[in-house]
Amino acid sequence: MNSTQTVLKINNLEIWAYHGWYPEERLIGGLYNIDISIGLDLNTTTLQLADTVDYQDVVDLTKSIMKREFKLIEESCTALYHEVLTLSTQINQLEVTVTKLNIPINNLQSTSFTIRS
């Protein structure tokens, strides 16, 4: 069996969510950008969808988690990180970044939080 380190990347997944420390942020909502990088040990001689992580499952999971109420992007990123890890036993590295766009602070375009293993 030929096992190779591979990386599946979900880039720039945009989601509107109602997170934030301030009540008006949770009322109005805002745009979030999600990046997920999943390191996998795959058998490259017989690649099938069942052998890897289906990125549609990752997108669906991300949308579901971002519907929850969080006051901090650290909370949403941590929840997403732990839930993605449950998708496959072949995940050996994971990096999740949640970026909050259009922050209600003058001259600040975005802020992000990243967790990686």
Where are these regions (language model features)?
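N-terminal, polar/charged subdomain of small-to-medium soluble alpha/beta proteins
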Residues: M1-S117
